[in-house]
């Protein structure tokens, strides 16, 4: 049976991307919530492969938004600051030909900001990079869909029409969203690597998949048909760290 999966915020971790693309079947569909680039070394490589993969619906993230504005000197300085992590991406862009850069920037500018998916159980998912509130106008709130962190405390509507509606997002690591809401006990626990996983909140209606992959070398592949994590994938750095901890 064909499956539909979602993942987010891979931030240049090519080994994680290789694991995911090799794990899914040719007939599966994959929704990526943005931020392929920055922080890690291989964002441009990942981005170009994703754009060429027919299985993938690629949504724009705030770091893709940085890339589309990189030609401005002021934006280059902002983008490549250490806290934004754009330096490896900017340097990789300079290795492309002028035509290749122009083609890539055009493709990124045209990426959608959100997607919707309804599974066979009648559960309807709205997906974007940063997340949003159910009553938002998805066609107008460009900034919020890429950058917003104010929706975390919004209460889920009680109307019947929202009963089978869910919002899936990245942008902010799950552990930080849970900490802000004082709900660390609700963060999914990954016993395989004794570390945090995804965070589901607002009575199960909002799902944060960002695991801070650039630092943790870990990413979640979420199954929209079964509403659960299909698998956690781990990069080499975390495996090495885990191994050294076990030896001591």
Where are these regions (language model features)?
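N-terminal active-site segment of His-dependent metallophosphoesterases
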Residues: 1-49, 53
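Active-site-proximal beta-strand elements of phosphoester/diester hydrolases
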Residues: 3-11, 124-131, 207-209
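Catalytic phosphate/metal-binding cores of nucleic-acid and nucleotide-processing enzymes, i.e., regions
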Residues: 6-7, 75, 115, 134, ...
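Active-site neighborhood of divalent metal-dependent phosphoester bond hydrolases
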Residues: 40-116, 121-123, 148, 153-157
């Amino acid at each position: 049976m064909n499956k539909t999966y979602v993942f987010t915020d891979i931030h240049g971790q090519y080994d994680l991307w290789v694991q995911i693309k090799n794990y899914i079947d040719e007939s599966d569909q994959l929704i990526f919530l943005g931020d392929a680039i920055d922080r890690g070394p291989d964002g441009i490589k990942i981005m170009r492969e994703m754009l060429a993969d027919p299985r993938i619906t690629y949504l724009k993230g705030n770091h893709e938004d940085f890339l589309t504005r990189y030609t401005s000197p002021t934006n280059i300085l902002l983008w490549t600051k250490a806290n934004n992590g754009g330096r490896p991406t900017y340097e990789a862009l300079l290795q492309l030909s002028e035509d290749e850069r122009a083609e890539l920037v055009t493709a990124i500018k045209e990426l959608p900001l959100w997607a919707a998916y309804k599974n066979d159980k009648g559960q309807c998912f709205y997906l974007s990079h940063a997340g949003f509130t159910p009553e938002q106008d998805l066609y107008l709130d460009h900034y919020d869909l890429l950058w917003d962190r104010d929706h975390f405390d919004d209460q889920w509507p009680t109307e019947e029409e929202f009963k089978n509606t869910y919002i899936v997002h990245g942008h902010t690591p799950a552990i930080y969203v849970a900490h802000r809401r004082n709900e660390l006990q609700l963060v999914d626990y990954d016993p395989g690597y004794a570390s945090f996983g995804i965070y589901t909140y607002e009575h199960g209606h909002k799902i944060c998949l960002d695991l801070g992959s650039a630092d943790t070398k870990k990413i979640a592949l979420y199954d929209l048909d079964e509403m659960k994590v299909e698998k956690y994938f781990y990069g080499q750095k975390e495996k090495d760290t885990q191994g050294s901890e076990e030896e001591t």
